[in-house]
């Protein structure tokens, strides 16, 4: 398997195929970095330390689950004197356990399938799919344009019943478009 196959199927750049292994319903690709360089200055003369071996989930191949296994390095650059973890561009964040391409595919299919159907197809937990959806929505609505808002409406809603489980939610909306600008706890 070439590095071109890694990129074309999974959008993984800068890594090359070492070996692969099959077990029942699983394909595990062992990959390694082609060249290690400082992400800050681009220097290739860096000292590396292997911190751990990671296994992340990729897009399935047919009915087989695909996993990628690789070493994660800590880098020290003598040129810019920075010490940092290597950047993994095919992950959405440092602690992600699946590739960006798998996350994107799950989110695209979520528009047409139920969470339970996605979980069965990709062998994921329900909470994993729900968290992906929450993160995508928070990224989408992180910055709401308020420059064109001329009039707002503020609602305070009582949530819960009784004294222990009750509270208020404050909702701020654009009165013209009806878009929610802010949702906050308490009054």
Language-model features: locations:
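Short, conserved DNA-binding cores of transcription-related domains
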Residues: 1-88
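Short, conserved catalytic/metal-binding motifs centered on acidic residues
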Residues: 38, 77, 118, 152-158
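Short, Lys/Arg-enriched anionic-surface-contact patches
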Residues: 81-102
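Short, amphipathic alpha-helical "recognition" segments used to contact nucleic acids or chromatin
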Residues: 98-113
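RNase H-like nuclease fold core
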Residues: 132-187
